[in-house]
């Protein structure tokens, strides 16, 4: 019982002191968090600061960063701290994190911060993505690739990303409850590379039907994506409902709909009138 309680207390303690910025650093390069000290500061102003003394005053000649002299990144959100990390690596350490290389090897000794640096922005909401991006290579990303993308967004200050993964899961659940069969659902929901154009009310069923394991896979993936975005302090934008329904909804469900016709030869979903 004592061991169980001790384990529970340790788990609670670890959760209480979880630091998303340190986790991000360690994903960039294992052990990198030990070379930094990230400090979350309460402020209405979006900012980050880079320092190396902890008090904002360099009273001695700057020394290379080390275990007892870490690079200090302050910010009023984890995303802003991540921007500060990226700024330091790029402008102080000469390390450029690219979209195709999110894990550069950091030197054992990082360059010193010669003087305190502060950057602010009045742009409170920084949005990313549109529907089309979710049906390019992103349609087939796994959790490992999504982790890198969320890190990339954080490093570049994105705090309001569109989160459209798994929208088809919600639609499937709703249509099944309305009496549609799995086969009929498959004829309405598009395949992975065409989901964006289906969600934009341009076509039905093209590239489908989706296999049953796809829905569970994408539901699980979206839950991980949302959890990580929220952990970083982002505000994910979830798709709303625009009135789209299957083109046969009038016949099947007795709904008052408007026929949207064709889009480049594709049957479009109907719209609620």
Model-predicted regions and their roles:
Residues 1-4:
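Positively charged n-region of N-terminal signal peptides that target proteins for export
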Residues 17-19, 237:
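Boundary of Sec targeting at the N-terminus
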Residues 9-17:
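Hydrophobic h-region of N-terminal signal peptides that target proteins for export
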Residues 96-99:
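Conserved short beta-strand edge segments in small beta-sheet-based binding/regulatory domains
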Residues 16, 27-29:
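N-terminal, post-signal-peptide metal-ligating segments of extracellular/periplasmic oxidoreductases
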Residues 29-44, 49-59, 65-78, 83, ...:
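Aromatic-lined carbohydrate-binding surfaces of glycoside hydrolases
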Residues 87-88:
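Short Gly/aromatic-enriched secondary-structure transition segments
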